[in-house]
Amino acid sequence: MLSVLVFLPLLAAAILAVVRMPDRSARIGWLAVCGAELVLLVLLWTGYRTPQAGQLAFAQQVPWLPGVGSSYSVGLDGLSLPLVALTVVVFAACAVFAWREQRRPRAQAALFCFLQSMCLGVFAAQDVVVFFVFFDLSIAGMYFAILGWGHGQPARSALKFFLYTFLGSLVLLLGFIGLYVAADPHTFDMAELTRQAPLRDSGWVGGVVLAAVLIGLAIKTPTVPFHTWLPPAHTDAPAIGSAVLAGVLLKMGTYGFVRIAMPMLPQAWRAWAWVIIAVGIVSVLYGALVALAQTNLKRMIAYTSVNHMGYVVLAVGAAGVLTGGTEGRQVAVTGAVTQMVSHGLITAALFLLAGVLHERRGSYRIDAYGGLAEPAPRFAGLLAVAAFASLGIPAFSGFIAEFQIFTGSIGAAPVTALALPGILVVAALFLRALQQLLTGPTRGKSIDFLDLRTSETLAVAPLLLGSLVIGLLPRFLLDVIEPASRVVVDLVSR
């Protein structure tokens, strides 16, 4: 069933690309695929039982490249299942949002179905080569999404995105080869590499391999100072491109930390833990302060992504500091995975709403609008909910995630409290943006602004509802994540 979930969108992409059909049929086909994916997701989630340490649910393994110890291997645990669910939900929201797309809708549907398969493959993969193949192809998919449906300077932004992230993937590949060479017997199987931890007692060699893996994943996350591709990519990407980029693709980097770097290179991770914490703190504060200076709504949201992903980096870094209690480090990792899901839902909604501004008036400038609450109450209401969810107000998933991150991280490494002002700065910038966009007399580009259409509302509202459900009833998600977090912390402590 898991392989069907992964490859069904790819099959749909091939059909959409080859078979000529009316635009409406292509849109319906895309929605049908997303509906089928949601059904499969529900079946997987309800059928999921927490596997024992070192095992996986819904595991499948087929020989692929036996000469180098690589196979098509997929499976789910508490780290991957939430991100698979996030991927399916975000892509479904994008399919609904794109219902009225007039520019090559069949090609767009085919491309995003392809991209969905690649993203699902990254989170389901249990072989390092399979992970890398899906990881790399997702870069190509997003490149064409920005180039083909972007605005502003899409060619330049797409090229910068591709070159920067592709360079990161090459560095990541070097790290993977280092793990393979050190393993005895040589293998790319994640479970075997985790069991062996082949570079555990290798000194500086393990540090070099971890550095390669960290840099490759940090570029995709992105963390400071590897973030410079992100703002232009978001600014010039279409709304659904930004939603997928922020909601799903950025999680590949942080997922790689907990799936590959931490369990396979535990000794090196512990040695680098304080550096990782420092990068997380800098990313939190830098992302918040630079976001505060933005006048472009999309760039502002992009920099808040640097801030929010910085919390994840900070938490996984704290998990490598053994001076803290094991329970606190487990809470930090649980918070990190919860933050990945939370940020994906909320930021995807924010980027879709920002896309409405550009679609209606061709501008993301905050000062070009004012008093939007009067002509567009649905837009104003959902934007306000998304903003408050993003700043971490209780009742939403962001609060659950950040509370766990700081509770666990401060216990292990009190210096992580230096990142707390980032929450205040993000609150200030979102409240200021809401005041400028929504309140006061209707002026500028807000005059005669068309409120959200039904398809736009149906795309955004479920994302925010998901954040609310996690914020109020987090147990269904935490019960999945917590056992896997304990395993990761135990592996890092070896």
Where are the model-predicted features located?
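Alpha-helical multi-pass transmembrane bundles of energy-transducing inner-membrane proteins
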Residues: 23-24, 107-114, 118-202, 290-363
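Alpha-helical transmembrane segments of multipass membrane proteins
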Residues: 13-18, 95-96, 117-121, 144-145, ...
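Predominantly late transmembrane helices and immediately cytosolic-facing juxtamembrane segments
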Residues: 224, 347-353, 414-448
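Central hydrophobic cores of alpha-helical transmembrane segments in multi-pass inner-membrane proteins
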Residues: 3-19, 31-44, 84-98, 115-117, ...
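Juxtamembrane/interfacial segments at transmembrane-helix boundaries in multi-pass membrane proteins
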Residues: 49-70, 137, 169-227, 232, ...
